[in-house]
Protein backbone atom coordinates (compact mmCIF):
# COMPACT_ATOMS: atom_id res chain seq x y z
CA UNK A 1 0.00 0.00 0.00
CA UNK A 2 1.49 3.37 -1.01
CA UNK A 3 1.14 6.84 0.53
CA UNK A 4 -2.41 8.02 0.93
CA UNK A 5 -3.69 4.43 0.91
CA UNK A 6 -3.01 3.90 -2.78
CA UNK A 7 -2.14 0.50 -4.13
CA UNK A 8 0.13 -0.19 -7.09
CA UNK A 9 -1.76 -2.71 -9.22
CA UNK A 10 0.15 -5.90 -9.99
CA UNK A 11 0.18 -6.82 -13.69
CA UNK A 12 -1.09 -10.28 -14.47
CA UNK A 13 1.35 -12.94 -15.63
CA UNK A 14 1.24 -13.60 -19.35
CA UNK A 15 1.92 -16.76 -21.33
CA UNK A 16 2.48 -14.84 -24.58
CA UNK A 17 6.05 -15.07 -25.91
CA UNK A 18 7.66 -12.98 -28.64
CA UNK A 19 10.63 -13.94 -30.78
CA UNK A 20 13.30 -11.47 -29.59
CA UNK A 21 16.06 -12.95 -27.45
CA UNK A 22 17.33 -9.49 -26.47
CA UNK A 23 15.08 -6.47 -25.86
CA UNK A 24 16.11 -2.89 -25.08
CA UNK A 25 13.42 -0.79 -23.38
CA UNK A 26 13.82 3.00 -23.41
CA UNK A 27 11.53 6.02 -23.31
CA UNK A 28 12.29 6.75 -26.99
CA UNK A 29 12.82 4.57 -30.01
CA UNK A 30 16.10 5.19 -31.87
CA UNK A 31 14.04 6.62 -34.76
CA UNK A 32 11.82 9.66 -35.24
CA UNK A 33 8.53 9.47 -37.10
CA UNK A 34 8.14 11.82 -40.06
CA UNK A 35 5.00 12.47 -42.08
CA UNK A 36 5.88 12.98 -45.75
CA UNK A 37 4.09 15.47 -48.04
CA UNK A 38 2.01 12.65 -49.54
CA UNK A 39 0.73 11.71 -46.07
CA UNK A 40 2.76 8.53 -45.68
CA UNK A 41 4.89 7.82 -42.62
CA UNK A 42 8.67 7.53 -42.78
CA UNK A 43 11.18 6.75 -40.04
CA UNK A 44 14.40 8.71 -39.61
CA UNK A 45 17.26 7.23 -37.61
CA UNK A 46 18.21 9.41 -34.64
CA UNK A 47 21.90 9.42 -33.68
CA UNK A 48 22.90 8.10 -30.28
CA UNK A 49 25.68 6.23 -28.54
CA UNK A 50 23.32 3.68 -27.00
CA UNK A 51 21.96 2.35 -30.29
CA UNK A 52 25.47 2.39 -31.78
CA UNK A 53 26.74 0.21 -28.94
CA UNK A 54 23.80 -2.18 -28.91
CA UNK A 55 23.06 -2.48 -32.64
CA UNK A 56 25.46 -5.39 -33.30
CA UNK A 57 23.99 -7.31 -30.38
CA UNK A 58 20.42 -6.51 -31.44
CA UNK A 59 21.15 -7.91 -34.91
CA UNK A 60 22.99 -10.97 -33.63
CA UNK A 61 20.39 -11.98 -31.05
CA UNK A 62 17.13 -11.28 -32.90
CA UNK A 63 16.85 -8.11 -30.86
CA UNK A 64 14.01 -5.61 -30.47
CA UNK A 65 13.77 -2.06 -29.14
CA UNK A 66 10.65 -0.95 -27.23
CA UNK A 67 9.95 2.79 -26.94
CA UNK A 68 7.85 5.81 -27.86
CA UNK A 69 8.12 7.10 -31.44
CA UNK A 70 7.83 10.75 -30.36
CA UNK A 71 4.36 11.29 -31.86
CA UNK A 72 1.26 11.98 -29.78
CA UNK A 73 -1.57 9.50 -30.42
CA UNK A 74 -5.25 9.65 -29.46
CA UNK A 75 -5.86 5.92 -29.03
CA UNK A 76 -3.14 4.54 -26.76
CA UNK A 77 -4.79 1.12 -26.44
CA UNK A 78 -3.94 0.18 -30.03
CA UNK A 79 -1.07 -2.31 -30.20
CA UNK A 80 1.05 -1.26 -33.18
CA UNK A 81 2.81 -3.90 -35.21
CA UNK A 82 6.62 -3.90 -34.91
CA UNK A 83 8.52 -1.67 -37.34
CA UNK A 84 11.54 -3.05 -39.16
CA UNK A 85 14.03 -0.25 -39.77
CA UNK A 86 17.55 -1.00 -41.05
CA UNK A 87 16.92 -4.63 -40.09
CA UNK A 88 16.17 -3.64 -36.48
CA UNK A 89 12.82 -4.58 -34.97
CA UNK A 90 11.21 -1.62 -33.21
CA UNK A 91 8.10 -1.94 -31.03
CA UNK A 92 6.29 1.40 -30.58
CA UNK A 93 4.49 2.30 -27.36
CA UNK A 94 1.78 4.91 -27.89
CA UNK A 95 1.58 8.03 -25.71
CA UNK A 96 -1.28 10.52 -25.59
CA UNK A 97 -0.97 14.26 -25.01
CA UNK A 98 -1.93 13.68 -21.36
CA UNK A 99 0.72 10.96 -21.09
CA UNK A 100 3.39 13.34 -22.36
CA UNK A 101 2.22 16.12 -20.03
CA UNK A 102 1.92 14.00 -16.88
CA UNK A 103 4.24 10.99 -17.25
CA UNK A 104 7.08 12.68 -19.19
CA UNK A 105 7.02 16.43 -18.59
CA UNK A 106 5.39 15.97 -15.19
CA UNK A 107 6.55 13.05 -13.07
CA UNK A 108 9.72 12.19 -15.01
CA UNK A 109 11.05 15.72 -15.55
CA UNK A 110 9.42 17.93 -12.92
CA UNK A 111 9.48 15.37 -10.07
CA UNK A 112 12.24 12.78 -10.57
CA UNK A 113 14.74 14.86 -12.58
CA UNK A 114 15.13 17.68 -10.01
CA UNK A 115 14.98 15.24 -7.08
CA UNK A 116 17.75 13.09 -8.55
CA UNK A 117 19.85 16.19 -9.34
CA UNK A 118 20.17 17.38 -5.74
CA UNK A 119 16.96 19.49 -5.75
CA UNK A 120 18.59 22.35 -7.69
CA UNK A 121 14.98 23.16 -8.61
CA UNK A 122 12.25 22.14 -6.18
CA UNK A 123 10.52 18.89 -7.27
CA UNK A 124 6.76 18.98 -7.77
CA UNK A 125 4.71 16.12 -6.32
CA UNK A 126 1.31 15.45 -7.94
CA UNK A 127 -0.71 12.29 -7.39
CA UNK A 128 -2.11 12.53 -10.95
CA UNK A 129 1.41 12.55 -12.37
CA UNK A 130 2.33 9.47 -10.34
CA UNK A 131 -0.78 7.60 -11.44
CA UNK A 132 0.07 8.35 -15.07
CA UNK A 133 3.68 7.25 -14.53
CA UNK A 134 2.40 3.90 -13.22
CA UNK A 135 0.03 3.53 -16.17
CA UNK A 136 2.65 4.33 -18.83
CA UNK A 137 5.25 2.07 -17.20
CA UNK A 138 2.68 -0.74 -17.32
CA UNK A 139 2.18 -0.19 -21.06
CA UNK A 140 5.94 -0.37 -21.62
CA UNK A 141 6.11 -3.58 -19.58
CA UNK A 142 3.24 -5.12 -21.56
CA UNK A 143 4.86 -4.25 -24.89
CA UNK A 144 8.13 -5.75 -23.69
CA UNK A 145 6.41 -8.92 -22.49
CA UNK A 146 4.90 -9.38 -25.96
CA UNK A 147 8.25 -8.80 -27.71
CA UNK A 148 10.59 -10.96 -25.61
CA UNK A 149 11.27 -14.59 -26.45
CA UNK A 150 11.00 -17.28 -23.82
CA UNK A 151 14.01 -17.03 -21.49
CA UNK A 152 15.17 -13.81 -23.17
CA UNK A 153 17.18 -10.90 -21.81
CA UNK A 154 15.70 -7.41 -21.29
CA UNK A 155 17.65 -4.21 -20.61
CA UNK A 156 15.52 -1.34 -19.25
CA UNK A 157 16.94 2.18 -19.54
CA UNK A 158 16.64 5.15 -17.22
CA UNK A 159 14.49 7.06 -14.76
CA UNK A 160 11.32 7.24 -16.86
CA UNK A 161 10.85 3.45 -16.56
CA UNK A 162 11.79 2.53 -13.00
CA UNK A 163 8.61 0.50 -12.39
CA UNK A 164 9.02 -1.67 -15.49
CA UNK A 165 11.35 -4.30 -13.95
CA UNK A 166 8.88 -5.35 -11.23
CA UNK A 167 5.88 -5.23 -13.58
CA UNK A 168 7.71 -7.22 -16.23
CA UNK A 169 8.86 -9.84 -13.73
CA UNK A 170 5.24 -10.39 -12.68
CA UNK A 171 4.23 -10.84 -16.33
CA UNK A 172 7.28 -12.81 -17.50
CA UNK A 173 9.20 -14.53 -14.67
CA UNK A 174 11.22 -16.42 -17.29
CA UNK A 175 13.12 -13.28 -18.35
CA UNK A 176 16.50 -12.01 -17.21
CA UNK A 177 16.05 -8.28 -16.54
CA UNK A 178 18.68 -5.54 -16.24
CA UNK A 179 18.14 -1.87 -15.42
CA UNK A 180 20.56 1.04 -15.91
CA UNK A 181 20.07 4.56 -14.55
CA UNK A 182 21.64 7.22 -16.78
CA UNK A 183 21.26 10.09 -14.29
CA UNK A 184 22.61 10.41 -10.73
CA UNK A 185 20.93 8.38 -8.00
CA UNK A 186 20.37 10.81 -5.11
CA UNK A 187 21.59 10.68 -1.53
CA UNK A 188 19.33 8.78 0.85
CA UNK A 189 18.00 11.88 2.63
CA UNK A 190 16.87 13.43 -0.67
CA UNK A 191 15.29 10.26 -2.06
CA UNK A 192 13.29 9.90 1.16
CA UNK A 193 11.35 13.06 0.22
CA UNK A 194 9.60 11.19 -2.58
CA UNK A 195 6.06 10.17 -1.54
CA UNK A 196 6.34 7.06 -3.74
CA UNK A 197 9.85 6.14 -2.60
CA UNK A 198 9.03 2.56 -1.65
CA UNK A 199 7.27 1.83 -4.93
CA UNK A 200 10.28 3.07 -6.92
CA UNK A 201 12.73 0.88 -4.98
CA UNK A 202 10.40 -2.10 -5.31
CA UNK A 203 10.12 -1.42 -9.04
CA UNK A 204 13.89 -1.46 -9.51
CA UNK A 205 14.24 -4.62 -7.42
CA UNK A 206 12.32 -6.48 -10.10
CA UNK A 207 15.59 -6.51 -12.06
CA UNK A 208 18.34 -9.10 -11.72
CA UNK A 209 21.01 -6.40 -12.08
CA UNK A 210 20.63 -2.69 -11.26
CA UNK A 211 23.38 -0.47 -12.66
CA UNK A 212 24.51 3.08 -11.89
CA UNK A 213 27.31 5.29 -13.22
CA UNK A 214 29.19 5.50 -9.95
CA UNK A 215 29.67 3.39 -6.81
CA UNK A 216 28.04 6.11 -4.70
CA UNK A 217 24.69 5.64 -6.45
CA UNK A 218 24.91 1.88 -5.93
CA UNK A 219 25.66 2.37 -2.22
CA UNK A 220 22.66 4.70 -1.85
CA UNK A 221 20.42 2.11 -3.47
CA UNK A 222 21.62 -0.64 -1.12
CA UNK A 223 20.87 1.53 1.92
CA UNK A 224 17.37 2.36 0.62
CA UNK A 225 16.68 -1.31 -0.12
CA UNK A 226 17.37 -2.08 3.54
CA UNK A 227 15.46 0.89 4.91
CA UNK A 228 12.37 0.89 2.69
CA UNK A 229 11.92 -2.76 1.74
CA UNK A 230 13.54 -4.48 4.70
CA UNK A 231 15.82 -6.49 2.42
CA UNK A 232 19.13 -7.98 3.47
CA UNK A 233 22.01 -6.41 1.56
CA UNK A 234 25.76 -6.69 1.27
CA UNK A 235 27.67 -4.17 3.39
CA UNK A 236 30.99 -3.78 1.58
CA UNK A 237 31.89 -1.07 -0.91
CA UNK A 238 30.84 -1.42 -4.55
CA UNK A 239 33.60 -1.17 -7.15
CA UNK A 240 33.59 0.00 -10.77
CA UNK A 241 32.59 -2.96 -12.96
CA UNK A 242 33.58 -5.17 -10.00
CA UNK A 243 32.70 -5.98 -6.37
CA UNK A 244 28.96 -5.93 -6.95
CA UNK A 245 26.55 -5.30 -4.11
CA UNK A 246 23.71 -7.71 -3.45
CA UNK A 247 20.12 -7.37 -2.28
CA UNK A 248 18.47 -10.52 -0.93
CA UNK A 249 14.71 -10.39 -1.45
CA UNK A 250 12.98 -13.65 -0.57
CA UNK A 251 14.44 -16.33 -2.82
CA UNK A 252 15.93 -13.77 -5.22
CA UNK A 253 19.37 -12.12 -5.25
CA UNK A 254 19.61 -8.78 -7.06
CA UNK A 255 23.09 -7.57 -8.00
CA UNK A 256 23.93 -3.86 -7.83
CA UNK A 257 26.88 -2.37 -9.69
CA UNK A 258 28.65 0.70 -11.09
CA UNK A 259 29.19 0.92 -14.86
CA UNK A 260 30.40 4.37 -16.04
CA UNK A 261 28.90 4.99 -19.50
CA UNK A 262 31.05 6.30 -22.33
CA UNK A 263 31.00 7.27 -26.01
CA UNK A 264 31.97 5.76 -29.37
CA UNK A 265 35.38 7.33 -28.89
CA UNK A 266 37.16 5.56 -31.75
CA UNK A 267 34.63 6.73 -34.35
CA UNK A 268 34.68 10.27 -32.95
CA UNK A 269 38.48 10.33 -33.01
CA UNK A 270 38.47 9.31 -36.68
CA UNK A 271 35.81 11.86 -37.65
CA UNK A 272 37.70 14.68 -35.93
CA UNK A 273 40.81 13.87 -37.99
CA UNK A 274 38.91 14.34 -41.27
CA UNK A 275 40.34 17.12 -43.45
CA UNK A 276 36.90 18.70 -43.91
CA UNK A 277 36.41 18.90 -40.14
CA UNK A 278 39.86 20.45 -39.75
CA UNK A 279 39.12 22.98 -42.48
CA UNK A 280 35.80 23.88 -40.87
CA UNK A 281 37.49 24.33 -37.49
CA UNK A 282 39.83 26.91 -39.04
CA UNK A 283 36.85 28.65 -40.64
CA UNK A 284 35.12 28.83 -37.26
CA UNK A 285 38.12 30.57 -35.74
CA UNK A 286 38.15 33.03 -38.64
CA UNK A 287 34.41 33.69 -38.31
CA UNK A 288 34.96 34.47 -34.63
CA UNK A 289 37.65 37.02 -35.55
CA UNK A 290 40.68 34.77 -35.02
CA UNK A 291 40.81 35.33 -31.26
CA UNK A 292 43.82 34.15 -29.29
CA UNK A 293 41.61 31.88 -27.16
CA UNK A 294 38.16 30.34 -27.65
CA UNK A 295 36.18 29.06 -24.67
CA UNK A 296 33.39 26.61 -25.53
CA UNK A 297 30.29 25.35 -23.74
CA UNK A 298 28.01 22.68 -25.25
CA UNK A 299 24.91 21.69 -23.33
CA UNK A 300 21.23 21.01 -23.38
CA UNK A 301 19.59 24.13 -21.96
CA UNK A 302 19.05 22.64 -18.50
CA UNK A 303 19.33 24.13 -15.02
CA UNK A 304 21.65 21.30 -13.94
CA UNK A 305 24.32 22.22 -16.50
CA UNK A 306 25.76 25.29 -14.79
CA UNK A 307 25.63 27.50 -17.89
CA UNK A 308 24.92 30.49 -15.65
CA UNK A 309 27.97 29.63 -13.53
CA UNK A 310 30.42 29.77 -16.45
CA UNK A 311 28.84 32.96 -17.81
CA UNK A 312 29.18 34.70 -14.44
CA UNK A 313 32.76 33.45 -14.06
CA UNK A 314 33.64 34.73 -17.54
CA UNK A 315 31.99 38.08 -16.84
CA UNK A 316 33.98 38.56 -13.64
CA UNK A 317 37.25 37.51 -15.30
CA UNK A 318 36.63 40.20 -17.92
CA UNK A 319 35.75 42.77 -15.25
CA UNK A 320 38.92 41.96 -13.28
CA UNK A 321 41.12 42.13 -16.38
CA UNK A 322 42.26 38.52 -15.93
CA UNK A 323 40.85 37.76 -19.39
CA UNK A 324 41.28 40.25 -22.23
CA UNK A 325 38.07 41.06 -24.08
CA UNK A 326 39.91 41.80 -27.33
CA UNK A 327 41.51 38.35 -27.66
CA UNK A 328 39.17 35.86 -25.91
CA UNK A 329 35.62 34.81 -26.78
CA UNK A 330 33.14 32.40 -25.25
CA UNK A 331 30.90 30.31 -27.51
CA UNK A 332 27.87 28.75 -25.83
CA UNK A 333 25.88 26.19 -27.84
CA UNK A 334 22.62 25.47 -26.01
CA UNK A 335 20.30 22.83 -27.43
CA UNK A 336 16.60 23.53 -26.72
CA UNK A 337 15.18 21.19 -24.09
CA UNK A 338 11.78 20.58 -22.44
CA UNK A 339 10.51 23.93 -23.62
CA UNK A 340 7.00 23.41 -22.23
CA UNK A 341 8.30 23.01 -18.66
CA UNK A 342 8.13 26.34 -16.78
CA UNK A 343 11.52 26.06 -15.06
CA UNK A 344 13.19 25.60 -18.46
CA UNK A 345 11.40 28.64 -19.91
CA UNK A 346 12.63 30.69 -16.95
CA UNK A 347 16.17 29.39 -17.41
CA UNK A 348 16.25 30.37 -21.08
CA UNK A 349 15.17 33.91 -20.26
CA UNK A 350 17.80 34.18 -17.51
CA UNK A 351 20.63 32.88 -19.71
CA UNK A 352 19.76 35.16 -22.61
CA UNK A 353 19.57 38.13 -20.23
CA UNK A 354 23.01 37.20 -18.87
CA UNK A 355 24.50 36.94 -22.38
CA UNK A 356 23.03 40.31 -23.31
CA UNK A 357 24.43 41.93 -20.17
CA UNK A 358 27.97 40.61 -20.77
CA UNK A 359 27.98 41.71 -24.41
CA UNK A 360 26.48 45.06 -23.50
CA UNK A 361 29.24 45.61 -20.97
CA UNK A 362 32.31 44.29 -22.80
CA UNK A 363 31.67 43.83 -26.55
CA UNK A 364 32.53 46.16 -29.39
CA UNK A 365 30.12 46.74 -32.27
CA UNK A 366 30.22 43.64 -34.47
CA UNK A 367 32.53 41.80 -32.03
CA UNK A 368 30.58 40.11 -29.21
CA UNK A 369 32.57 38.45 -26.44
CA UNK A 370 29.86 35.80 -25.97
CA UNK A 371 28.45 34.00 -29.03
CA UNK A 372 25.24 32.22 -28.02
CA UNK A 373 23.30 29.74 -30.18
CA UNK A 374 20.00 28.32 -28.93
CA UNK A 375 19.39 25.64 -31.53
CA UNK A 376 20.57 22.14 -32.41
CA UNK A 377 23.99 22.02 -34.06
CA UNK A 378 24.73 19.35 -36.72
CA UNK A 379 27.08 16.64 -35.50
CA UNK A 380 30.01 17.44 -37.78
CA UNK A 381 29.70 21.15 -37.02
CA UNK A 382 29.84 20.35 -33.30
CA UNK A 383 32.98 18.27 -33.81
CA UNK A 384 34.56 21.18 -35.69
CA UNK A 385 33.79 23.44 -32.70
CA UNK A 386 35.51 20.92 -30.41
CA UNK A 387 38.61 20.98 -32.62
CA UNK A 388 38.57 24.79 -32.91
CA UNK A 389 38.26 25.61 -29.21
CA UNK A 390 41.09 26.11 -26.72
CA UNK A 391 39.19 25.50 -23.47
CA UNK A 392 36.11 23.34 -22.99
CA UNK A 393 33.86 24.45 -20.10
CA UNK A 394 31.81 21.66 -18.50
CA UNK A 395 30.42 23.07 -15.24
CA UNK A 396 27.25 21.18 -14.21
CA UNK A 397 25.95 21.51 -10.68
CA UNK A 398 25.17 17.78 -10.91
CA UNK A 399 25.49 15.32 -13.79
CA UNK A 400 25.37 11.54 -13.91
CA UNK A 401 28.29 11.36 -16.33
CA UNK A 402 28.50 14.17 -18.95
CA UNK A 403 29.50 12.73 -22.29
CA UNK A 404 30.36 16.13 -23.80
CA UNK A 405 33.55 16.16 -21.73
CA UNK A 406 34.55 12.78 -23.16
CA UNK A 407 33.58 13.83 -26.70
CA UNK A 408 35.85 16.87 -26.49
CA UNK A 409 38.78 14.73 -25.37
CA UNK A 410 38.14 12.15 -28.11
CA UNK A 411 38.28 14.91 -30.74
CA UNK A 412 41.68 16.24 -29.65
CA UNK A 413 44.15 13.92 -31.38
CA UNK A 414 46.38 17.01 -31.71
CA UNK A 415 46.68 16.97 -27.89
CA UNK A 416 45.61 20.61 -27.91
CA UNK A 417 42.94 22.20 -25.78
CA UNK A 418 42.08 22.03 -22.10
CA UNK A 419 39.07 20.77 -20.15
CA UNK A 420 37.56 22.63 -17.18
CA UNK A 421 35.32 20.05 -15.52
CA UNK A 422 32.90 20.15 -12.60
CA UNK A 423 33.72 17.83 -9.70
CA UNK A 424 30.01 16.96 -9.59
CA UNK A 425 30.00 15.05 -12.87
CA UNK A 426 30.51 11.32 -13.15
CA UNK A 427 33.21 12.05 -15.73
CA UNK A 428 35.37 13.74 -13.07
CA UNK A 429 36.12 10.33 -11.53
CA UNK A 430 37.72 9.24 -14.82
CA UNK A 431 39.13 12.47 -16.30
CA UNK A 432 41.36 13.36 -13.39
CA UNK A 433 43.74 15.43 -15.53
CA UNK A 434 41.05 17.98 -16.33
CA UNK A 435 41.02 21.26 -14.42
CA UNK A 436 38.53 20.13 -11.79
CA UNK A 437 36.35 22.86 -10.26
CA UNK A 438 33.54 23.17 -7.74
CA UNK A 439 30.71 24.98 -9.59
CA UNK A 440 29.39 26.30 -6.27
CA UNK A 441 32.72 28.09 -5.71
CA UNK A 442 32.77 30.92 -8.25
CA UNK A 443 36.32 31.99 -7.38
CA UNK A 444 37.47 28.41 -7.90
CA UNK A 445 35.76 28.26 -11.30
CA UNK A 446 37.45 31.51 -12.31
CA UNK A 447 40.83 30.19 -11.19
CA UNK A 448 40.29 26.96 -13.15
CA UNK A 449 39.40 28.84 -16.33
CA UNK A 450 42.40 31.14 -15.95
CA UNK A 451 44.76 28.18 -15.39
CA UNK A 452 43.39 26.41 -18.47
CA UNK A 453 43.77 29.52 -20.62
CA UNK A 454 47.37 30.02 -19.51
CA UNK A 455 48.65 26.43 -19.37
CA UNK A 456 51.95 25.71 -21.09
CA UNK A 457 51.87 23.64 -24.25
CA UNK A 458 53.81 20.84 -22.55
CA UNK A 459 51.44 20.69 -19.56
CA UNK A 460 48.40 20.78 -21.82
CA UNK A 461 49.65 17.94 -24.00
CA UNK A 462 50.46 15.84 -20.94
CA UNK A 463 46.97 16.34 -19.49
CA UNK A 464 45.19 15.68 -22.79
CA UNK A 465 47.26 12.57 -23.53
CA UNK A 466 46.27 11.06 -20.19
CA UNK A 467 42.58 11.84 -20.67
CA UNK A 468 42.57 10.47 -24.22
CA UNK A 469 44.12 7.22 -23.03
CA UNK A 470 41.21 6.81 -20.60
CA UNK A 471 38.46 7.76 -23.07
CA UNK A 472 39.74 5.66 -25.97
CA UNK A 473 40.23 2.57 -23.79
CA UNK A 474 36.84 2.79 -22.08
CA UNK A 475 34.34 3.30 -24.90
CA UNK A 476 30.59 2.73 -25.07
CA UNK A 477 31.05 -0.78 -26.43
CA UNK A 478 33.09 -1.75 -23.38
CA UNK A 479 30.40 -0.21 -21.14
CA UNK A 480 27.63 -2.24 -22.78
CA UNK A 481 29.64 -5.46 -22.75
CA UNK A 482 30.58 -5.06 -19.09
CA UNK A 483 26.94 -4.56 -18.09
CA UNK A 484 25.58 -7.39 -20.20
CA UNK A 485 28.30 -9.78 -19.06
CA UNK A 486 27.40 -8.99 -15.45
CA UNK A 487 23.71 -9.42 -16.28
CA UNK A 488 24.36 -12.84 -17.80
CA UNK A 489 26.19 -13.83 -14.61
CA UNK A 490 23.19 -12.59 -12.61
CA UNK A 491 20.77 -14.85 -14.47
CA UNK A 492 18.96 -17.19 -12.06
CA UNK A 493 19.65 -20.85 -12.76
CA UNK A 494 15.96 -21.61 -13.06
CA UNK A 495 14.94 -18.51 -15.03
CA UNK A 496 14.40 -20.40 -18.26
CA UNK A 497 12.01 -22.75 -16.49
CA UNK A 498 10.26 -20.15 -14.37
CA UNK A 499 7.23 -19.91 -16.64
CA UNK A 500 6.56 -23.65 -16.72
From Swiss-Prot:
Sites annotated Involved in alpha anomer selectivity: 113, 183
EC number: 2.4.1.15, 2.4.1.347
GO biological process per UniProt: trehalose biosynthetic process
One Pfam entry name: Glyco_transf_20
Keyword Glycosyltransferase in annotation: yes
Cited Gene3D superfamilies: Glycogen Phosphorylase B
This protein's record includes keyword Phosphoprotein: no
Swiss-Prot/TrEMBL catalytic activity: ADP-alpha-D-glucose + D-glucose 6-phosphate = alpha,alpha-trehalose 6-phosphate + ADP + H(+); CDP-alpha-D-glucose + D-glucose 6-phosphate = alpha,alpha-trehalose 6-phosphate + CDP + H(+); GDP-alpha-D-glucose + D-glucose 6-phosphate = alpha,alpha-trehalose 6-phosphate + GDP + H(+); TDP-alpha-D-glucose + D-glucose 6-phosphate = 5-methyl-UDP + alpha,alpha-trehalose 6-phosphate + H(+)
Pathway: Glycan biosynthesis; trehalose biosynthesis
Residues binding UDP-alpha-D-glucose: 48-49, 300, 305, 403-407
Keywords, comma-separated and alphabetical: Glycosyltransferase, Transferase
Top EC class for this record: transferase
GO cellular component, one term: cytosol
Residues annotated for D-glucose 6-phosphate binding in this entry: 28, 104, 158, 338
Protein origin, superkingdom: Bacteria
Annotated GO MF terms: alpha,alpha-trehalose-phosphate synthase (GDP-forming) activity; alpha,alpha-trehalose-phosphate synthase (UDP-forming) activity; trehalose-phosphatase activity
InterPro entries from the UniProt entry: Glyco_trans_20
General function of this protein: Probably involved in the osmoprotection via the biosynthesis of trehalose and in the production of glycogen and alpha-glucan via the TreS-Pep2 branch involved in the biosynthesis of maltose-1-phosphate (M1P). Catalyzes the transfer of glucose from UDP-glucose (UDP-Glc) to D-glucose 6-phosphate (Glc-6-P) to form trehalose-6-phosphate. Probably also able to use ADP-Glc, CDP-Glc, GDP-Glc and TDP-Glc as glucosyl donors.
Similarity field: Belongs to the glycosyltransferase 20 family.
Subunit architecture: Homotetramer.
Protein name: Trehalose-6-phosphate synthase
